[in-house]
């Protein structure tokens, strides 16, 4: 490593051929691309001795990344997981002006007459080429929200909140209000004191 203050990983460390001894002690993390949750559990519950990180997961192609909530729950319930990096940030396309319907046109995968290309496989980001969010980014943002409601006692009108931030008291930035409606009409509303 050029910088000893940085953690090292090597995704291909998972591939062994059984013909030679591999030396992985210099790696700080065990990393994988696209493992299932059961594969991660097998490593963690087995003899895995390094923190587990997904160097790619939840491919954002098509109508977005899937299983984000399942992965979040797994990361949260296993201390040896470090989370992961969703593939990928931005659709790769070239702006070609406005179409007849006045919508933006983007070229990709053969649109410029090239013979060798990746088709629509370059359109796999969390944002469009102009950086507008896809629905997948909004889902990802929601999954990683800093505070969640984890319970509600209807009898006593008590909400239970879970603060996922390590160093911030939710009272420092969160305000809570409510509205109770009946047939679209507000019956009552108010503010709620935020617990620490």
Role assignments for model-derived ranges:
Residues 1-160, 164-172, 177-185:
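Extended substrate-binding grooves/exosites of carbohydrate-active enzymes
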